[in-house]
Structure formats: structure tokens, C-alpha cells
From Swiss-Prot:
One of its GO terms (biological process) is aflatoxin biosynthetic process. Belongs to the cytochrome P450 family. It catalyses: versicolorin B + NADPH + O2 + H(+) = versicolorin A + NADP(+) + 2 H2O. Pathway: Mycotoxin biosynthesis; aflatoxin biosynthesis. This is Versicolorin B desaturase. Heme binds at residue 438. It is an enzyme of class 1 (oxidoreductase).
Length: 500
């Protein structure tokens, strides 16, 4: 009888197992009937590579264009690009278990404590209740002076680079302004980036930490997350702890302040101090993790929306129409406030269209189908399957939006008119839907509206096409890895400062 040698067995057994695994995923797996690229259906390796490279959501756009609104992108994961999926996956349905976020794709804090981003249904509701006042209309009115203060300070800083004939890098300035604002709203004090004309190092730590999070996600999916410190590139090592340390320092200072500061923590600290062990306040560890989440979510989303809006306005030529609406509506910049800018229809349409083409949070973790399975888009999906809606694939699909690849703010003002009356606006959910939709949506809209209004009232902007290139061609690690955005700035009423 012939027996394979030991060296041969070392090769044959793993190869045989691999072939069996690939064959099962393609021909016998419960999701075998879903379309998708062959290698992605057979193995999770292409998915891991795309996640590490930051190209996942651009790949999903290509796949949905080829295979339709439902695509299998991993042996156990399905991506959707339609309105029904938002409702089936994210909407709250009484009596139905929640589709929880995939734990493999969630960033874990060094202290292992939950935050509003990483929590079960019960604790998520507790966190939202505690932060509810800060993000309510009443809370926004309290925060308005802070938002106005940093928008005005941004205007003053941009005066230094206006009318020089040289283009200014706007992502840098938006990051400074919004990071200062969110610092004041999160911790009762600014990071003073605009005053120092220098970005706080926490911004760099945030961006590099997100890349390291992608690496840890891949290793966690393989059961070897403990190797993360050993495989991270040198420049990324320690960024997770550095990001955490900044939050510790700032929150400790905030907790020592007496009285209301007009920030996110006023009601939380009072409620937590008076908790009496009922469990409806926050522990110190929970406050810390939520503080870190608020800074990242509150600064990056708004800075991205501002950058995207300015680029798309200038590239499309729509900036003249937006500027005209603002200057016609306000005789003085002091007249610009949160209430008045909310009544500018075209500016609001500009923001909505920006978030369609350049969503503030392009990468969201998929949800996990609960026990016993569920029906998604008319088909039964077995439990433990990962399911999600791709923002970019959904918003750039021609079956959802007319001229989907074009920046047309008017589509949001003419929903019942040709050619936009057939657009599927239910598919447009930049802030998600359901119980876990973005709690900071109103604040983000307020900051973007007011900042754009202030800038377009004071200045004329022209895109420096040569230095900027295609601004939308960016990688994504949960948030955009933003390119530089160069613009010529001239003070309103002066001659053009851009080169002829």
C-alpha cells in the first residue's frame, strides 16, 4: 500500500483543506446563490486586502455596478445598495432582535469599556439618553456662541492667506477650526489650533490610529489580534494609546471644572454624580471612551463635509449660486446665525448633495443577522451573516439617482419634478437610520451651514486644479484619508488673486 511521505503530507493536507474550504464557500455555503466576484465569494482574503489598502468602498462601487444592488463580498457577508436594505437592517422593528454591529469591525478602547459606538442595545440607549440634551435643539442654542466663535476665528485666519496670489490648503484650516470647536464643546476648552496656526498632534494620532484599527480588524477576524503590536508599521505604533492619552488628559481637566460649561458633559456629569448606583449615569471609564468617540466623530465628519462641499461647489461652478443666496440673505456677517442659515434652501441642498457624493462617514461596520435569521430585501438571510449598506455604491447607482455621478444640489429642491422625480430618496441615508443613527447629525448640519455661510459671505473661492487634482480620489479607513485641497481666496469685493 502506498503512503505519502511526511513532507508530502505537510503540503497535501493544508492544500486539500484550502480547496475544500474554497469549494464549500462557492458551491455549498448558504449564501452561494448571491452574486459577486468569484475570489471574494470563495475567500475572505480579497476583503482583508481591500480593508488594509483602504479601497474597500471603491471596490464595492465597482461590484454593485456590475452585479446589481445585492453583492456577496465575503463568504459570510452581503453588501446592499438600495433603500429597502436600510429599513430591513437598521430600522427598529418591535419584537424583532436588533441587527448588532459586527464586533470584529469595532474599535476597542484600551480600557475595554463600552462607548456609544461599541455597546449593546440597553447601554446604547443609556448613552443616547445621557447625551440627548447636548444634541437637542435646546442644546444647540446653548452651543451656538461657541460654533459662531470658531467660524469667525477661521475667517480671521483666512484673511492672512487671502489676496496673496497663492492657494491655501483648506483641509488644514477646516481641521483646525472644527477641532478647536469640538474641543470646546467636548471638554469646555479649545485646542487653540487656530490661534497657534498649528494643528494639535491629536489630529495626527486620530488619522494614524484609524489605519492601525484596520490592521487590528483583519488580525481579529483571523483570531490573532494579539500580534497587532508586532506587525504595525513603526509610524503607527503607539497611536492608539496616544489617542487615548489625549482623551484622558482633557477629560480629567473637564471634570475638575465647576459649573456648566455649555458643552456635551454638563448634564452627563450631573446625572452621573447623582446616580446612586442606579446604573443610569456613566462610569469614569465610559466617560473617557465616549469623550474619545465624540472628538473623532465630531471633528472628522464636519471637516470632511466642509472640504467636500467647497471642492464640489468650485469644481461644478455652483459656488456662485450658493454665494449669491448667502449675500442676498445677509446684509452683515453678524446676521448669520444657526436659525437664519437653516432657512437657506440652496445652501441646505448643497450640503445634502455633498453628503451624497462625499458622505461624512463613508465606512460603517456591517451588522450581524440575529438568531433565527431575517429577511433582507425579500430574501431570507441566515443568522450570523454580515450585512451592510454601502453609502458610495448606493448613492452613485444610476437606478437610485439621475445623473448619479454629477453634483446637482437642485435635485434636493425639485424632488417632484423632471428629471429627479424618479430618484430614490429613501436610499439616501448619510446619517444612517434607526436607533443607532448619528446622534450628532443636528450639530454637524449646524456647523457646516454656519461655517460655509460665513466663508462665502466674506470671500470668493477658486479651486487650484493643478495642485488639488481629483479630491474625491481618496482611500477610506472608516473615515476619509483626505487629500490636500488647494484654493485661491480673495476678499469679497477685491480683484482676483488667482493667476491668469
Amino acid at each position: 500500500m502506498y503512503f505519502l511521505s511526511l513532507p508530502s503530507l505537510v503540503i497535501v493536507i493544508p492544500v486539500g483543506y484550502l480547496l475544500f474550504h474554497l469549494g464549500y464557500n462557492l458551491f455549498f455555503h448558504p449564501l452561494r446563490g448571491y452574486p459577486g466576484p468569484l475570489l471574494w465569494r470563495a475567500s475572505s482574503l480579497p476583503w482583508k486586502i481591500a480593508l488594509l489598502r483602504g479601497t474597500m468602498h471603491h471596490d464595492l462601487m465597482r461590484f454593485h455596478q456590475k452585479y446589481g444592488d445585492t453583492v456577496r463580498i465575503k463568504p459570510d457577508e452581503i453588501s446592499y445598495a438600495n433603500a429597502q436594505a436600510w429599513r430591513d437592517i437598521h430600522a427598529h422593528v418591535p419584537g424583532r432582535p436588533e441587527f448588532l454591529k459586527d464586533p470584529v469591525r469595532l474599535p476597542l478602547a484600551p480600557n475595554g469599556v463600552m462607548s456609544i459606538l461599541v455597546s449593546d442595545t440597553k447601554n446604547h440607549a443609556r448613552f443616547r439618553s445621557l447625551f440627548g440634551h447636548a444634541f437637542s435643539d435646546k442644546g444647540l442654542r446653548t452651543q451656538e456662541s461657541t460654533i459662531v466663535q470658531y467660524a469667525d476665528l477661521l475667517v480671521e485666519v483666512l484673511r492672512e492667506v487671502a489676496d496673496t496670489g497663492r492657494s491655501a490648503e483648506m483641509v488644514y484650516y477646516f481641521n483646525m477650526a472644527i477641532f478647536d470647536s469640538i474641543g470646546a464643546l467636548s471638554f469646555g476648552e479649545s485646542f487653540d489650533s487656530l490661534k497657534s496656526r498649528q494643528l494639535h498632534p491629536w489630529v495626527d494620532a486620530i488619522h494614524k490610529n484609524l489605519k492601525s484599527v484596520a490592521i487590528s480588524h483583519v488580525l481579529r477576524s483571523m483570531g490573532i489580534e494579539f500580534l497587532t503590536p508586532y506587525v504595525l508599521p513603526k509610524e503607527l505604533r503607539g497611536k492608539r494609546q496616544e489617542n487615548y492619552s489625549y482623551a484622558v488628559e482633557k477629560l480629567n481637566k473637564r471634570m475638575k471644572m465647576e459649573g456648566d460649561q455649555g458643552d456635551f458633559w454638563d448634564k452627563v456629569l450631573v446625572k452621573s454624580a447623582d446616580d446612586n448606583q442606579r446604573g443610569d449615569g456613566m462610569s469614569a471609564g465610559e466617560m473617557l471612551n465616549n469623550a474619545a468617540v465624540m472628538v473623532v466623530a465630531g471633528s472628522e465628519t464636519t471637516a470632511s463635509a466642509l472640504s467636500g462641499a467647497m471642492y464640489l461647489l468650485c469644481l461644478s461652478g455652483k459656488i456662485e449660486k450658493a454665494t449669491a443666496e448667502i449675500r442676498k440673505s445677509f446684509a452683515s456677517p453678524e446676521d448669520i446665525d444657526l436659525i437664519s442659515v437653516s432657512h437657506l434652501p440652496y445652501l441646505t441642498a448643497v450640503i445634502d448633495e455633498t453628503l451624497r457624493m462625499y458622505p461624512a462617514v463613508p465606512g460603517q461596520p456591517p451588522r450581524v443577522v440575529p438568531a433565527s435569521g431575517a429577511t433582507v430585501c425579500g430574501r431570507f438571510v441566515p443568522e450570523e451573516t454580515r450585512v451592510g449598506v454601502s453609502h458610495l455604491a448606493t448613492y452613485f447607482a444610476d437606478y437610485n439617482f439621475t445623473h448619479a455621478d454629477k453634483f446637482i444640489p437642485e435635485r434636493h429642491l425639485q424632488k417632484t419634478e423632471e428629471p429627479f422625480k424618479y430618484d430614490n430618496y429613501g436610499a439616501y441615508q448619510p446619517w444612517s437610520v434607526g436607533l443607532r443613527n448619528c446622534i450628532g447629525r443636528n450639530l454637524a448640519y449646524a456647523e457646516v451651514r454656519l461655517t460655509l455661510a460665513k466663508l462665502l459671505w466674506h470671500f470668493d473661492f477658486t479651486l487650484d486644479v493643478d495642485k488639488t487634482g481629483n479630491f474625491l480620489d481618496q482611500k477610506i479607513w472608516s473615515i476619509w484619508a483626505k487629500r490636500e485641497l488647494y484654493m485661491f481666496i480673495k476678499t469679497r469685493g477685491t480683484s482676483s488673486s488667482s493667476p491668469q
